[in-house]
């Protein structure tokens, strides 16, 4: 049986520029059914019980996400403007930010890309259950 962490955090990198997608806006802000992709992603995680801190990592100067979070009633999510040039750099900066906000080395952090909006709350809950039931 895995050691159950005191806290499970969520880190969603959202600092992409959309250059590979060839879009005017970053891909995470592309609309799907009238809402930005990132909002679909955040809503899925928002429905999962037992998550501690939920952090979205954006590029420095990006205020678009905070506006969207407020607009869709998700203003309680934390946003850190520490995104890097690559996804890996953004994740590392996000992990450092979580640590500076009290996350411990023993806590778990779930990382999920902002533009991967087809995740469902049941998928997330099942992953947590599977990890808790197996030595990781």
Task: Set out the residue ranges of the language-model regions.
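Short active-site oxyanion
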Residues: 51-55, 78, 135
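Conserved beta-loop-beta/alpha segment of the NTase-like Rossmann-fold superfamily
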Residues: 85-136
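Acidic helix N-cap motif at the loop->helix transition within catalytic regions
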Residues: 63-69
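N-terminal glycine-rich phosphate-binding loop and ensuing alpha1 helix
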Residues: 4-63
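Short, glycine/charged-enriched secondary-structure capping and boundary segments
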Residues: 25-28, 69-72, 95-96, 123-127
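Short helix-capping segments at alpha-helix termini
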Residues: 48-50, 71-77, 102-103
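Conserved donor nucleotide-binding strand/loop of the catalytic core
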Residues: 73-87
């Amino acid at each position: 049986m895995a050691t159950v962490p005191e806290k499970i955090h969520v880190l969603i990198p959202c600092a992409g520029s959309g250059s590979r997608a060839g879009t005017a806006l970053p891909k995470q802000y592309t609309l799907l059914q009238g809402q930005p992709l990132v909002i679909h992603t955040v809503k899925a995680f928002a429905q999962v019980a037992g998550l501690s801190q939920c952090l979205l990592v954006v590029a420095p100067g990006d205020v678009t996400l905070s506006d969207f979070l407020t607009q869709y009633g998700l203003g309680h999510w934390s946003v850190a403007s520490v995104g890097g040039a690559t996804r890996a750099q953004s994740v590392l900066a996000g992990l450092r930010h979580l640590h500076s906000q009290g996350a411990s080395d023993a806590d778990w952090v779930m990382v999920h890309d902002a533009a991967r909006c087809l995740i469902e709350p049941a998928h997330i809950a099942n992953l947590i259950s599977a990890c808790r039931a197996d030595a990781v």
